[in-house]
């Protein structure tokens, strides 16, 4: 082979051909894309980890640590629960007739009145919370033959004995407690919420001393419902000096309906009604401080931005919030596949295109050109292909947010001990929903990432094919994203290729002439095949001569005998 190369060299000299090298009659043009030294790993449908030049985090994993009071109206419960504020606990009087979008209950909240229980506490709490108001209207109930406004030392209002301000404790008058039968129609066009109760004395003596009868009864009815409660007399654990209890009940009276109260003792009567409203108000348990700031989304941990489609802060939210998922991170590719530049090359130590690696330092575009010609080297971005890719990628984040952000709140689910199985079922359903959303989120992001990478690769290929169609036979595809241009191509010529105004006919003759020049040791010209065929033919000829000479020599020595038969 060395002999062949040497002969080729002599042959080229004899014909007066120019050897390839750093002449001024050719140029190199490479196409490439942006790259960064350290990219970001994302997940796609086909790859668990693929490096891209840029990515955006989609999961909000931290809160501000404070609850913003704008645009939602936040009502701080301070040391009162919503039910205590509803009943009119003396230390919660400041909440009378208040309104809210979100009522925040604190862990330090406590009751400071007569000990009570609410058999359907969660439902009442949720009902009042969603109404968003404690607006109370006093009504003129007529209670004949009984003593009103009972009080207790367990419920101090100032230095005096008191009671819940929204309830009326009825006891005997003298030595009688007549049967009470009171009606109250709803002539308005809204629902009315009535709160009432039943007193459970701790002893029979307390029962008769308050209500005369040994056993009382309370029945509250509307056309749609009826509740009858018989007091349970018996001692209970002491709370604020009392072993008796009050059970709190509630009744909703629709427009046109009638409230009927019938009792012969133990009645804790309503003083009026709460005006019910429909809305998206809610309640949340949180110890985060309330601050003057703006946030659409609130969690018990504090407010969070809603500029991301997912969050991992808390399942409980209020407002327009990202969807809760289990993942701590989900990254959306907002750049192309990253192939860091090989630093040993230098800028043009060995010029290479996008097939080998990306180009670092392209700050003015995602795709571009590098060239090497008689005037030196240079680089320029292709803004058209860059903008085409950016336009399609920019809307991705907004589309994902639109698909996932909830325009409603996820309230706390509470159940009584009796409803334990329902609570377990609810928890299972919620956990299943979270699992499904977490899976869907991961799949959605992987699909979008796959599309982004395919899209950016496609734009690179489009630019390469566009350049190839312009150059035609005037250049040769070097296989690494570069073209060897076989004519003198100055900077103006390079610019015409970049902007699509290159006229290949102008340079055709020069390119064809240079293209067929022998390229010396590179053996890349059209003579390479001829030289190889000639070398092969000469080798075969010499082999035949040697073989024929050996046969003739052997015949002369008598080692080989040939018989020819006719």
Curated annotation (Swiss-Prot):
- Which of this chain's residues carry glycans? 24, 38, 54, 97, 181, 301, 499
PTM per Swiss-Prot/TrEMBL: Palmitoylated. In natural infection, inactive HA is matured into HA1 and HA2 outside the cell by one or more trypsin-like, arginine-specific endoprotease secreted by the bronchial epithelial cells. One identified protease that may be involved in this process is secreted in lungs by club cells.
Drop me one GO molecular function for this one: host cell surface receptor binding
The residue ranges crossing the membrane are 531-551
Top-rank taxon, per record: Viruses
Coiled coil where? none
* Residues annotated as signal peptide: 1-16
Against Pfam families, the record matches this protein to: Hemagglutinin (PF00509)
Q: Name one GO cellular component term.
A: viral envelope
Q: List the disulfide bonds.
A: 30-482, 68-293, 80-92, 113-155, 297-321, 489-493
Alphabetically list the UniProt keywords: Clathrin- and caveolin-independent endocytosis of virus by host, Clathrin-mediated endocytosis of virus by host, Disulfide bond, Fusion of virus membrane with host endosomal membrane, Fusion of virus membrane with host membrane, Glycoprotein, Hemagglutinin, Host cell membrane, Host membrane, Host-virus interaction, Lipoprotein, Membrane, Palmitate, Signal, Transmembrane, Transmembrane helix, Viral attachment to host cell, Viral envelope protein, Viral penetration into host cytoplasm, Virion, Virus endocytosis by host, Virus entry into host cell
Site Cleavage — annotated at 345-346
Localization, per the record, is: Virion membrane; Host apical cell membrane
Intervals, Cytoplasmic compartment: 552-566
Lipid modification (S-palmitoyl cysteine) maps to 555, 562, 565
Its record classes its membrane topology as: Single-pass type I membrane protein
Q: Which GO terms describe its biological process?
A: clathrin-dependent endocytosis of virus by host cell; fusion of virus membrane with host endosome membrane; fusion of virus membrane with host plasma membrane; viral budding from plasma membrane; virion attachment to host cell
Listed HAMAP family = INFV_HEMA
Additional note from the record? Major glycoprotein, comprises over 80% of the envelope proteins present in virus particle. The extent of infection into host organism is determined by HA. Influenza viruses bud from the apical surface of polarized epithelial cells (e.g. bronchial epithelial cells) into lumen of lungs and are therefore usually pneumotropic. The reason is that HA is cleaved by tryptase clara which is restricted to lungs. However, HAs of H5 and H7 pantropic avian viruses subtypes can be cleaved by furin and subtilisin-type enzymes, allowing the virus to grow in other organs than lungs.
Q: What does this protein do?
A: Binds to sialic acid-containing receptors on the cell surface, bringing about the attachment of the virus particle to the cell. This attachment induces virion internalization of about two third of the virus particles through clathrin-dependent endocytosis and about one third through a clathrin- and caveolin-independent pathway. Plays a major role in the determination of host range restriction and virulence. Class I viral fusion protein.
Q: How does it assemble?
A: Homotrimer of disulfide-linked HA1-HA2.
What is the name of this protein? Hemagglutinin
Q: Which organism is it from?
A: Influenza A virus (strain A/Northern Territory/60/1968 H3N2) (Influenza A virus (strain NT60))
